[in-house]
């Protein structure tokens, strides 16, 4: 515990930031609005309407903030707060959205300053390619082939919202900002009469995405902060024994009793915790913990993580959230890919003087394939096909021009091929291309009240070129053809791109 306190003291901010006065500046809300329009937020397949920005309404909001001391009222009298309440539903929604977006922008400033002030800032540009999602897969190819067991963890949430505020209190010493955060949480819970935290989290995630991402990332950052500290300390467990490991879970409440009952227990050495080859990867609210150790070691880590969430976050994690599997005989869903470690046979010819030998061996390989069922299910939800994969027209797009329809379908197809370029089997991708191509043809035919055959004959090669992917364009320069056509099976090699910074819409579509 002493080591943990020292470690926490080193990680605290050395300066006290007062970000609350920035909420009374109009440019903060304009910046938040512009950031929402120009940010990397994915555009939904069915489209969405951006919230309009009004400087007049922002000025009215700032005046109301000056007139009401809502920071104190939100704690003492949460039901008597009228800052965001308005007879007009639009005004109430606008005040709520723009204030939460501005608050998220302001409260991120201390965390941004912390990153910029790190001594390794000169080395950051060298690793910009690591922002790509695909950069994780070469890491898995290099490391997972030598590991034995894997734990698939669903990071538990929501925890109690007051705990989230307390977590931020350790990082931000601005009391007024923390009161404002409590005000937001009380406002949403009272406005919708919600008692279950899961519904409140869903509401924040839907209507105030930036604020939700900030709260969720703060919570996950705190989890990883302690996990990495304990992971570093686990290398010392060979000297301190499993008994001390158990006592850390229960915060040393039984240490003296243990010492009296079993005086020689703490001098034992248990080698099972010595595991230098443990790797951790987090994505989409999930995490993968892979190890070269024994099943007993993975079970102990599972128990430890469950106790960690229970005692530190007061949250009971269901056992199903941590699934343990042997890496050799199982597959796992990772960033839209269905990944597994396979053993491929390899015949090696060994020539020794006059004799030749054929040696059969097996090599491990990380196999990444496209999950056909889930991807077709996403296309079905987006109304490109039926549940069985039969292409259908998209009536909502018939009001667009022919070029816009072709461009939308072609862009979706190219993005899917681009994201799944690392797949070792491309048959599923060609099936997806067929679905999108025929869905596009039926949409255009429905718009012009014609048949698919007639429309395809009229467009000809122009229609096919829209669904020509980047890889096929490179191959078309090498193998010239009069009519562009997809090269089935001609490029089975996996390609990992370094410009993919978010998961494809259809991969993460719900």
Curated annotation (Swiss-Prot):
Classification via InterPro entries: Domain_X, Maturase_MatK, Maturase_MatK_N
Record-linked Pfam families: Intron_maturas2, MatK_N
Localization of this protein: Plastid, Chloroplast
Keywords: Chloroplast, mRNA processing, Plastid, RNA-binding, tRNA processing
GO molecular function: RNA binding
GO cellular component labels: chloroplast
TM spans (from-to): none
Highest taxon, organism lineage: Eukaryota
Keyword tRNA processing: yes
Keyword Ribonucleoprotein: no
One of the protein's GO biological processes: mRNA processing
Family assignment from sequence similarity: Belongs to the intron maturase 2 family. MatK subfamily.
Known function: Usually encoded in the trnK tRNA gene intron. Probably assists in splicing its own and other chloroplast group II introns.
This protein's name: Maturase K
Organism, scientific name: Anomochloa marantoidea (Herbaceous bamboo)
Organism lineage string: Eukaryota, Viridiplantae, Streptophyta, Embryophyta, Tracheophyta
Gene from which the chain derives: matK
């Amino acid at each position: 515990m002493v080591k943990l306190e020292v470690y926490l003291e080193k990680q605290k901010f050395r300066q006290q930031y007062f970000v609350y006065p920035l909420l009374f500046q109009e440019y903060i809300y304009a910046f938040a609005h512009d950031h929402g329009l120009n940010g990397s937020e994915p555009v939904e397949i069915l489209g969405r309407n951006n919230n309009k920005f009004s400087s007049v309404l922002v000025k009215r909001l700032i005046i109301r903030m000056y007139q009401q001391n809502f920071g104190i009222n939100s704690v003492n009298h949460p039901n008597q707060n009228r800052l965001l309440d308005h007879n007009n539903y639009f005004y109430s929604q606008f005040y709520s959205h723009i204030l939460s977006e501005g608050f998220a922008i302001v409260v991120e400033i201390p965390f941004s300053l912390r990153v910029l002030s790190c001594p390794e800032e000169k080395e950051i540009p060298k690793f910009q390619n690591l922002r790509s999602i695909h950069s994780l897969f070469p890491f898995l190819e290099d490391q997972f082939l030598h590991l034995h067991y894997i734990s698939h963890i669903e990071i538990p949430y929501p925890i109690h919202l007051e705990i989230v505020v307390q977590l931020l209190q350790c990082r931000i010493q601005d009391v007024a900002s923390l009161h404002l955060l409590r005000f937001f949480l009380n406002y949403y819970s009272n406005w919708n009469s919600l008692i279950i935290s899961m519904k409140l989290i869903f509401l924040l995630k839907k209507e105030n995405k930036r604020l939700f991402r900030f709260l969720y990332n703060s919570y996950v950052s705190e989890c990883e902060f302690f996990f990495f500290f304990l992971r570093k300390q686990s290398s010392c467990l060979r000297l301190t024994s499993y008994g001390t490991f158990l006592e850390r879970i229960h915060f040393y409440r039984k240490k003296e009793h243990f010492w009296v009952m079993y005086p020689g227990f703490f001098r034992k050495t248990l080698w099972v915790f010595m595991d230098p080859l443990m790797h951790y990867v987090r994505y989409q609210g999930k995490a993968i913990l892979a190890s070269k150790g024994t099943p007993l070691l993975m079970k102990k880590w599972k128990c430890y993580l469950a106790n960690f969430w229970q005692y530190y976050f007061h949250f009971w994690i269901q056992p199903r959230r941590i699934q343990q599997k042997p890496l050799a005989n199982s597959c796992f869903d990772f960033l839209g890919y269905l990944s597994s470690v396979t053993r491929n046979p390899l015949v090696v010819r060994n020539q020794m003087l006059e004799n030749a030998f054929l040696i059969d061996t097996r090599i491990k390989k990380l196999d990444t394939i496209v999950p056909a069922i889930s991807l077709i299910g996403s296309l079905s939800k987006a109304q490109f096909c039926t549940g069985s994969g039969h292409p259908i027209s998209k009536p909502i797009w018939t009001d667009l021009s022919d070029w816009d329809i072709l461009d939308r379908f072609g862009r979706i197809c190219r993005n899917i091929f681009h994201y799944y370029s690392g797949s070792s089997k491309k048959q599923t991708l060609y099936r997806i291309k067929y679905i999108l191509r025929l869905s596009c043809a039926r949409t255009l035919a429905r718009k012009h009240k014609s048949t698919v055959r007639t429309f395809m004959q009229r467009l000809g090669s122009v229609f096919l070129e829209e669904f020509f992917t980047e890889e096929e364009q490179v191959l078309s320069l090498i193998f010239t053809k009069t009519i562009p056509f997809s090269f089935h099976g001609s490029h089975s090699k996996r390609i990992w791109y370094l410009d993919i910074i978010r998961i494809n819409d259809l991969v993460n579509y719900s």
